[in-house]
């Protein structure tokens, strides 16, 4: 199929339901970013940014009705397919910081997990091999064009050269959990020999500058002297 070119793309009313576990979601997206979703437990609309909810509104009952329809349809399709399960795909994860890393300055780590199918996954943050729950937020499942899903998990943190981080991904398509490692890249300190060489080069450049400057001054004085002509007595 030919791709359709557009300046902006809105995906409205994406409904997902699967069993077992009564897992479902209803989302709205714009240009690949989540706008809002309906929380099944709280039965309310959750906006990605609170400011969005001040501009417009969405009745969560509409999303809950769509999910109920998805649940009913899934039961019919399961019987027709003789309960044949979907193929599990292996997701792919990448970890990167939101902003350039400066030690001691607050930042956010992002774990981007793509090619998720079916949309059931556990994403866990580890700091120095220990689970971290404070400062963690993740999006709902966002739809890809090939009908797989992606999800982002965020961790607010303060970079330190003593800490290392891992994003742990667990999914039915993986034989074992996948750990994506991240740690701040700290420039290695210069050795004494390197510092000595740098200082020597700096001193040499300075001396050359002094010599060249002195030569130019002398030449300038000589040129000024030869250009003078004695006046009449």
Swiss-Prot record:
Record keywords: Adaptive immunity, Disulfide bond, Glycoprotein, Immunity, Membrane, MHC II, Transmembrane, Transmembrane helix
Start and end residues of each Ig-like C1-type domain: 91-183
Annotated stretches, region: Alpha-1: 1-88
Region listing for Alpha-2, in residue ranges: 89-182
Glycosylation sites: 122
Cellular location(s): Membrane
Extracellular side: 1-195
InterPro entries documented for this protein: Ig-like_dom (IPR007110), Ig-like_dom_sf (IPR036179), Ig-like_fold (IPR013783), Ig/MHC_CS (IPR003006), Ig_C1-set (IPR003597), MHC/Immunoglobulin (IPR050160), MHC_I/II-like_Ag-recog (IPR011162), MHC_II_a/b_N (IPR014745)
Pfam families: C1-set, MHC_II_alpha
Record-given protein name: H-2 class II histocompatibility antigen, A-S alpha chain
Cytoplasmic side: 222-233
Family: Belongs to the MHC class II family.
Ranges that cross the membrane: 196-221
GO biological process: adaptive immune response; antigen processing and presentation; antigen processing and presentation of exogenous peptide antigen via MHC class II; antigen processing and presentation of peptide antigen; positive regulation of T cell differentiation
Biological source species: Mus musculus (Mouse)
Membrane topology (UniProt): Single-pass type I membrane protein
Region (Connecting peptide): 183-195
Disulfide bonds: 111-167
GO terms of molecular function: peptide antigen binding
Gene designation per UniProt: H2-Aa
A single cellular component GO annotation: external side of plasma membrane
Primary location class: membrane
